[in-house]
Amino acid sequence: MFVDRARIYIKAGDGGDGAISFHREKYISKGGPDGGDGGKGGDVIFVVDEGLRTLQDFRYKTRYRAEDGQNGGSSNCSGRSGEDLIIKVPPGTLVKDEQTGRILADLVKPGKKVVIAKGGKGGAGNQHFATPTRQVPSFAKPGEPGEELWVILELKLLADVGLIGFPNVGKSTILSMVTAAQPKIANYHFTTINPNLGVVNIDAENAFVMADIPGLIEGAHQGVGLGHEFLKHIERTKLLIHVVDISGSEGRDPVQDFEVINEELKKYNPVLCERPQIIAANKMDVTGAEENLEKFRKVIEPRGYKIFPVSAASNKGLKELIYYAAQKLKELPDTVLVNDQDNEVVYTAVEEEPFNIRKENGVFVVEGSWVQRLVRSVNFDNYESLQYFQRAIRRKGIVDALESMGINEGDTVRMYDLEFEYFR
C-alpha cells in the first residue's frame, strides 16, 4: 500500500546539568569552583534518502528521541554532547508542525539535511558564578530541555507528469501501456484509490516518471470523493496530461468534464491552473468519438491547449503523446512548494519579548521564554541560587514592571510552576 502521510513525535535531547565542584589538591586547602558545563542535547535532523519511496516505516514507529547531553564534571570538564538523531525520509517529504500547520521543511534534494528540533543547551557549571563577593558558589545551572513536537509528514509524489481527469476515463490504462506499472484497471469509479507510479523510457538517455492520479470529481477541492487526498499529489508535477473521455460513454460532455476538473484545480490551489497541460482525448475507438472531438477542438484549441486523439485500449496515438510530453518536460523548471532559501532556516521561533505580565484572579502571572528558562535553571532550595534568581529578575526589569502594575507586599506572583509572595 502506498503510504503518503504519517504523524510522529520528535524530541531533541536535553542539555546536561552543570556541575557543582571545587578544586581539590594536596596542600591547597581552599580550591576554587571548577564545575564543568553540561553537554548540549542532540538535534533531530531529517535527511533525504533517495533510496526510500514511502513513509511506511513511520506507521510502526511513531516516537523518536535524540540523546541527552551528559552532565558536567569536576576539574572544569564539560559533559559530552548528545548524538544527533538522523531520520531518513524519501524525496518529496513535506514536514509540518501539527499544532500550527506551519511547513517546517520541504525535503526534495537527495542528501538535504534540516534540523527540525534543536537540542537543549548544557547548563553552566558553578565556575561561571564566582564573583569577588561569592567566591565559592554552591549552585550551577541545569541543562535546558530539547525541543519537542508532533509533526505531520506528507509525501508528495515526485512525478514529472501527472495524469488527471474524471474517474474511469482511462488514466490507468494509459499508464499501463507506456510504463511497466501494473495498476488495477476496471470499469467503475475509483478503481485507483492510491497513486500509481511508472517510468516512461523514451530512449537510453531520456526517461521520466508518470503518476496516475486517482480520479477527480466535482467538489474535490472540498474533499468530495477523497479530493484532498488526490489533489495534493498534483502539486509538484511539472506537467499534466488531462485525460478526457472524448466518446462521452458515461453520458457526460467532454468539454464540461474538462472545465470541471480545471475549476477544481483552481479552487484547491490557483497555482495548479498555471501548470502546463496536454490533453489526451481518449476512447477514440468508441462510436461518436470523432464527432465529439471536432466539437471539443473548436472550444478548447483556441485556448492554446495541445490535443492528442488516443485510444489507450488499442495503444493508438500514445507514442506521439509521450514523445511530446518528454520534449515539453525539457523546457520546464522543477516545481517545489517552498524555495531552498526557506529550507535553510526552519523551525526558528519568532523573537519574543523576554517576559509579559498579566493579572489573573488577583495573581500576577509572569510568562515568557526567558522566564521559563530561568525558573528551570534555579535550585530554590539553595540560598545562593535563590539570590541569583532575585538579582536576575531585578536586572531584567520584572520587579519594576510588577511595581508599575501596582503590586503590593504579600501579593502572589506565579512564574510557571513557581509561586511566591512578593516582598521588597
Curated annotation (Swiss-Prot):
Domain Obg span(s) in chain numbering: 1-158
Keyword Magnesium: yes
Disulfide bonds: none
GO MF: GTP binding; GTPase activity; magnesium ion binding
Binding residue positions for GTP: 165-172, 190-194, 212-215, 282-285, 311-313
UniProt domain OCT: residue ranges: 347-424
OBG-type G domain mapped to chain residues: 159-330
Cellular component aspect of the GO annotation: cytoplasm
Cofactor: Mg(2+)
InterPro entries: G_OBG, GTP-bd, GTP-bd_Obg/CgtA, GTP-bd_prot_GTP1/OBG_C_sf, GTP1-OBG_CS, GTP1_OBG_dom, GTP1_OBG_dom_sf, OBG_GTPase
Any GO BP annotation: ribosome biogenesis
Location of the protein in the cell: Cytoplasm
Chain residues that bind Mg(2+): S172, T192
UniProt EC number: 3.6.5.-
Range of residues in the leader sequence: none
UniProt KW ATP-binding keyword: no
Function per UniProt: An essential GTPase which binds GTP, GDP and possibly (p)ppGpp with moderate affinity, with high nucleotide exchange rates and a fairly low GTP hydrolysis rate. Plays a role in control of the cell cycle, stress response, ribosome biogenesis and in those bacteria that undergo differentiation, in morphogenesis control.
Complex and partners: Monomer.
Homology family: Belongs to the TRAFAC class OBG-HflX-like GTPase superfamily. OBG GTPase family.
Protein name in UniProt: GTPase Obg
Organism: Acetivibrio thermocellus (strain ATCC 27405 / DSM 1237 / JCM 9322 / NBRC 103400 / NCIMB 10682 / NRRL B-4536 / VPI 7372) (Clostridium thermocellum)
